[in-house]
Curated annotation (Swiss-Prot):
It is found in: Cytoplasm. GO terms for cellular component: cytosol. Keywords: ATP-binding, Cytoplasm, Ligase, Nucleotide-binding. It comes from Escherichia coli O6:H1 (strain CFT073 / ATCC 700928 / UPEC). Monomer. Pfam families: Lip_prot_lig_C, LplA-B_cat. (R)-lipoate binds at residue 134. One of its GO terms (biological process) is protein modification process. Belongs to the LplA family. Its main location: cytoplasm. In the transfer reaction, the free carboxyl group of lipoic acid is attached via an amide linkage to the epsilon-amino group of a specific lysine residue of lipoyl domains of lipoate-dependent enzymes. Residues 29-216 form the BPL/LPL catalytic domain. This is Lipoate-protein ligase A. The gene is lplA. It is an enzyme of class 6 (ligase).
Length: 338
């Protein structure tokens, strides 16, 4: 039986692909070396310890139907589109060595005619007239007996969209968690016009086979058929859940303030695991009672626009005379936390 395994996903769903990755990683024999090739449609992928409200423009992502996906490895936030090729190398210990997988990717690029080199712990760069430019970023995960190295290669990514989604709104957010470091990047198409995802995948798999001296048939993973992986349904449900992608954010505080025709409002939220643990309201409104009631209702509420809006609108039952003010308040709060 071969010690190698090659999997290729034909899904562009980030939650599907990350669930496949997680299942394979948990269940692979310790003697196996795995290469998984995949790519995602419009997605911001954040590190395990990151806060999406701090790292991302979540409002614009929602408007543009860009998904958020939290991965199980560390590191920073990245934007994926179909101009990215994603790779994952897995191995049991002591075989696992990220320098080996890095050299495989460098050999693949060299075979395509691109001279790249490792920079720091996570990046691959190429030299251009404007200086070094990043073409690949990576992250890692290790357990007691195995590890993986996954990353992306920029082929023809829409680099203008990086700034759209990775620059958060200027919210008054005091947040813990790992902050992303932005790098100067370039696409491989600048060096190899017309290069395709399929060509890059072929180069990586050939370099993978060459390094280990054996070949295997590729297994195609498709969303049209549930992958034959134990616990895949449960893993996918978790990977696609709000509780994982947003709710796992480190604790943070959020200050909102706005002035309406009927008075100024200042809201202070403390948020932990996606739930509001403390809500304070300050106002110079002549009728502060609805806002005081709102503070009580928001305690324990999910920090989600639809849930906050629901709690605001529920106040109309007790304060029907606020039929003008409460919808304004509701729309403002929902917009501010998206």
């Amino acid at each position: 039986m071969s010690t190698l395994r090659l999997l290729i996903s034909d899904s562009y769903d980030p939650w599907f692909n990350l669930a496949v990755e997680e299942c394979i990683f948990r269940q692979m024999p310790a003697t196996q070396r795995v290469l998984f090739l995949w790519r995602n449609a419009d997605t911001v992928v954040i590190g395990r310890a990151q806060n999406p409200w701090k790292e991302c423009n979540t409002r614009r992502m929602e408007e543009d139907n860009v998904r958020l996906a939290r991965r199980s490895s560390g590191g920073g936030a990245v934007f994926h589109d179909l101009g990215n090729t994603c790779f994952t190398f897995m191995a049991g210990k002591p075989e696992y060595d990220k320098t080996i997988s890095t050299s495989i990717v460098l050999n693949a690029l060299n075979a395509l005619g691109v001279s790249a080199e490792a920079s720091g712990r996570n990046d691959l760069v190429v030299k251009t007239a404007e200086g070094d430019r990043k073409v690949s970023g990576s992250a890692y995960r290790e357990t007691k007996d195995r590890g993986f190295h996954h990353g992306t290669l920029l082929l023809n990514a829409d680099l203008s969209r990086l700034a759209n989604y990775l620059n958060p709104d200027k919210k008054k957010l005091a947040a813990k968690g790992i902050t992303s470091v932005r790098s100067r990047v370039t696409n491989l198409t600048e060096l190899l016009p017309g290069i395709t995802h399929e060509q890059v995948c072929e180069a990586i798999r050939e370099a993978f086979f060459a390094h280990y001296g054996e070949r295997v048939e590729a297994e195609i993973i498709s969303p049209d058929k549930t992958p034959d992986l134990p616990n895949f349904a449960e893993t996918f449900a978790r990977q696609s859940s709000w509780e994982w992608n947003f709710g796992q954010a480190p604790a943070f505080s959020h200050l909102l303030d706005e002035r309406f025709s009927w008075g100024g409002v200042e809201l202070h939220f403390d948020v932990e695991k996606g739930h509001i643990t403390r809500a304070q309201v300050f106002t110079d409104s002549l009728n502060p009672a609805p806002l005081e009631a709102l503070a009580g209702r928001l305690q324990g509420c999910l920090y989600r626009a639809d849930m906050l809006q629901q709690e605001c609108e529920a106040l109309l039952v007790d304060f029907p005379e606020q039929e003008k003010e409460l919808p304004e308040l509701s729309a403002w709060i929902a917009g501010a936390v998206r």
